[in-house]
C-alpha cells in the first residue's frame, strides 16, 4: 500500500517538473496540430462533403467515443478507481463532457469544413488566451501579471494578423467557418477551466475517459438521427480514423493531467504552438498555400507563450 502511494506521488511530481511539463505540453500541442489535416483527409476518404452535417457528427462521435473507451480500458487494466466521490458530481461530469467533447468538436468539425486548416489552427488559439485570463479569476495558483496580459495581447494580435489582406483565406470573417471555430475555442476554454474540478471529483484519467466516451456518444446519436452515415469506407480512411483516435487519447490524457496539478495558464499557453504545427501540417498534407501572415501569427503566438511562462504565478 505504501509503495503504491509512493509511486503515485512520483507520478504526480513528474507532471509538475518544469522540463516534463514542457515536454508533455509540447507533445499534446504537436499531436493536436496534426489533427487539422487528418480530419480533412478523413472526410475526403470517407466521402463526407461539407453539407453532410450528420455524417460529420457521426465521424467525430466515433472518434471520441472509441478514444474514451480505450482510456477507460487502460484505467481498468491499471486498476484505477472509477468511483465518483459524490453522486451529485455526475451532473458536473456530464456538463464537462458536453463542453470538452460534444460542443467543442461539433463546432470544430463544422468550422473546419468551411475554413482552410491553417487558418482554423491559428484562429483556434483564442481559447488559449481566454483560459490564461479566466484562470486568474478562478484559481489562486494563477495570478494576473503584466507579463501574462502582454503575452495574451501579443497572442491575440496573431489572430488579428490572420485576418489581414485579401488573398486566399484572408477574404474576411465567415460564421460557418471562422464563427464555428471561435465557438469551438470558447467551449475548449470552459472545459480547460472545468478540468481542475473534474480532478476533485474523480481520477483525472478516468474523468478524461468519461468525457470523451460520453461526449462522443452525444455526437453519434444526433448525427445518426440526422441521417449521418460513412458513405465510403476504405483502408486509408480507417487509418486516418485510427490516427485521430490516437491523437485524442494522447493529447487529452497528457493535457488534462497537466491541468490537474499545475497552474492552468502555464499549461494552456503551450497550445499557442498548435497553429504553427497545424499550418505546417496542412500545407504539407493538403497542399494549402503558406501565406506570410501565418508565419507572423505563429511568431506572435510563440512570443506570447514565452512571456506568460517567463513570469511567476
Predicted features along the sequence, with ranges:
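Helix-helix packing/entry segments at the starts of transmembrane helices
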Residues: 62, 101, 105, 119-126, ...
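Transmembrane alpha-helices of multi-pass small-molecule transport proteins
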Residues: 2, 49-100, 130-134, 187-191, ...
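Small-residue-rich packing faces within the transmembrane alpha-helices of Major Facilitator Superfamily
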Residues: 33, 61, 65-69, 156, ...
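Specific transmembrane alpha-helical segments of multi-pass solute transporters/efflux pumps
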Residues: 35, 76-120, 124, 161, ...
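Hydrophobic/aromatic residues within transmembrane alpha-helices
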Residues: 42, 59, 111, 137-140, ...
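Hydrophobic transmembrane alpha-helices of multi-pass small-molecule transport proteins
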Residues: 1-2, 71, 133-134, 146-166, ...
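Juxtamembrane helix-entry segments on the extracytoplasmic side of multipass membrane proteins
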Residues: 17-22, 52-57, 85-90, 164-187, ...
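Glycine-/small-residue-enriched transmembrane alpha-helix faces in small-molecule transporters
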Residues: 2-58, 98, 170-197, 217, ...
Amino acid at each position: 500500500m505504501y509503495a503504491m502511494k509512493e509511486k503515485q506521488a512520483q507520478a504526480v511530481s513528474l507532471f509538475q517538473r518544469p522540463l516534463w511539463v514542457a515536454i508533455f505540453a509540447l507533445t499534446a500541442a504537436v499531436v493536436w496540430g496534426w489533427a487539422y489535416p487528418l480530419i480533412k483527409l478523413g472526410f475526403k476518404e470517407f466521402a463526407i462533403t461539407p453539407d453532410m452535417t450528420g455524417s460529420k457528427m457521426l465521424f467525430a462521435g466515433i472518434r471520441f467515443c472509441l478514444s474514451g473507451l480505450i482510456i477507460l480500458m487502460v484505467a481498468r487494466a491499471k486498476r484505477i478507481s472509477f468511483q465518483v466521490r459524490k453522486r451529485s458530481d455526475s451532473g458536473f461530469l456530464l456538463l464537462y463532457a458536453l463542453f470538452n467533447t460534444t460542443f467543442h468538436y461539433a463546432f470544430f468539425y463544422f468550422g473546419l469544413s468551411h475554413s482552410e486548416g491553417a487558418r482554423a489552427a491559428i484562429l483556434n488559439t483564442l481559447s488559449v488566451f481566454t483560459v490564461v485570463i479566466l484562470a486568474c479569476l478562478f484559481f489562486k495558483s494563477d495570478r494576473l501579471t503584466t507579463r501574462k496580459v502582454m503575452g495574451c495581447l501579443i497572442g491575440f494580435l496573431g489572430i488579428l494578423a490572420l485576418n489581414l489582406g485579401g488573398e486566399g483565406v484572408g477574404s474576411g470573417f465567415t460564421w460557418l467557418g471562422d464563427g464555428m471555430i471561435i465557438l469551438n475555442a470558447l467551449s475548449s476554454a470552459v472545459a480547460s477551466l472545468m478540468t481542475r474540478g473534474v480532478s476533485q471529483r474523480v481520477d483525472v484519467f478516468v474523468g478524461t475517459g468519461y468525457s470523451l466516451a460520453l461526449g462522443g456518444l452525444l455526437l453519434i446519436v444526433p448525427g445518426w438521427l440526422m441521417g449521418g452515415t460513412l458513405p465510403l469506407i476504405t483502408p486509408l480512411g480507417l487509418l486516418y480514423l485510427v490516427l485521430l483516435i490516437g491523437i485524442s487519447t494522447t493529447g487529452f490524457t497528457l493535457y488534462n493531467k497537466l491541468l490537474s496539478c499545475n497552474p492552468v495558464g502555464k499549461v494552456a499557453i503551450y497550445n499557442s504552438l498548435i497553429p504553427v504545427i497545424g499550418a505546417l501540417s496542412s500545407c504539407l498534407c493538403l497542399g494549402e498555400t503558406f501565406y506570410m501572415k501565418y508565419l507572423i501569427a505563429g511568431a506572435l503566438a510563440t512570443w506570447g507563450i514565452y512571456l506568460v511562462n517567463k513570469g511567476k504565478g
